[in-house]
């Protein structure tokens, strides 16, 4: 538990008449003539500003001298007393550490900006012999009042709080937090250079304080504080980034190509370099110019393309791609072969198939002749349905002259309809339609003969008188009847 009582060795025995700080001069009190002097070093960087009350600790008879800051003047009294030449660049923590052996030395506190109002400023350059003339008028120091003792307690508490705050500035990993100046130094000089600068400053600060136990005198080294503008200028000079260059390098290149004449062609590649290289194309040593048929495209991340809208025979040859920048150049070569365009002709009917009408059971042929380069593919449809070839009844024949024959055996009524023939090749398509009608075969019948009636007497007299036939022949009815029947095609009636 913390004890707020004032340490006994911290409170010096006082004169019953009280003590007052006097202007610089020789001591008249009964203290030893030899005065102790303490040394304090002021760091260029201060972390926190603390208030300091000079009346809390000045009662100890210590003579402190400094050449960098003015000393307090004497109080408004006729009797000059003790000689106190104080330097106010000393923090409360440093002052307590000089008195209390157990207290650590703090070097990161600021110079107290104010002192007790009972003191007045005096010139530092005041001669020492002028101070000795006031030694005879020194009065005995009065007793320190209680409010001054209470102020010293508050200073001690503030010193302990400052110690706790310094511990709080450490991070969890044990690294100390960077101040604004350290951050700026790291940004301008880099982390390694900044660390080296601060280590050099810390080593100089640790070596600079010199404490003489015999004289106990304060030596304050005057260090020139570097201004922010000059530090930035030096950092900019040291941290100047030198521009770097990298020669071109092809990461991706196209392979040799063979393209048919009239087709589209594209060559893609990727190149890197710093700064970005300029790309040029050459065909047989002559630069390739961008026009309607040749285009050069540059995309992001170093991708380039050479495009041929329509490949011509004159585009064939070795292409050299050259990439240049300040650091150098790189080259690759690709071969482009252009194949001659084949002569093509769309299919054309020399003669078309004719419509036909056949009887059931007959064999029919649908013939046509087609001319095309290259030879076309043929498709036959019946009523918009594909015709199945290579069956027992239906077959397709064609020759090199372009004659095409669709043969249908044993035609039936199912084979009737509209037939469409299509010829297709790379150059085009042609079609033609024809009609096939199938009818039933008719049945042939003979008409019935007409019957005639003939009298036999007539035939007898005719035979005797007209032709002079034999009596026997004249009276032979069967022979006459057969003759008449053969001439007229008549048959003998059953009624006779």
UniProtKB/Swiss-Prot annotation:
Q: Where is this region: Necessary for interaction with FLNC?
A: 213-491
Protein's cellular compartments: Cell membrane, Sarcolemma; Cytoplasm, Cytoskeleton; Cytoplasm, Myofibril, Sarcomere, Z line
Instruction: Please give the chief subcellular localization of this protein.
Output: membrane
A Gene Ontology cellular component where this protein is annotated is: Z disc
Q: Key word Cytoplasm present in the record? A: yes
Query: Which residue ranges have biased composition labelled Polar residues?
Result: 202-213, 221-233
**Modification sites for Omega-N-methylarginine:** 20
Q: Which cysteines are joined by disulfide bonds?
A: none
**What keywords would UniProt list here?**
Actin-binding, Cell membrane, Cytoplasm, Cytoskeleton, Immunoglobulin domain, Membrane, Methylation, Muscle protein, Repeat
Region annotated Disordered, chain positions: 1-37, 202-239
Q: Domain named Ig-like C2-type: which ranges? A: 248-333, 347-439
Q: Highest taxon of the source? A: Eukaryota
For this UniProt entry, the molecular function terms from Gene Ontology, in alphabetical order, are: actin binding; alpha-actinin binding
Query: Which residue intervals make up region (Necessary for interaction with ACTA1)?
Result: 213-496
Q: Which Pfam families match?
A: I-set (PF07679)
InterPro entries, A to Z: Ig-like_dom, Ig-like_dom_sf, Ig-like_fold, Ig_I-set, Ig_sub, Ig_sub2
Indicate the quaternary assembly.
Homodimer. Interacts with ACTA1, ACTN1, FLNA, FLNB, FLNC, and MYOZ2. Interacts with the C-terminal region of MYOZ1.
Q: What is this protein called?
A: Myotilin
* Organism field: Mus musculus (Mouse)
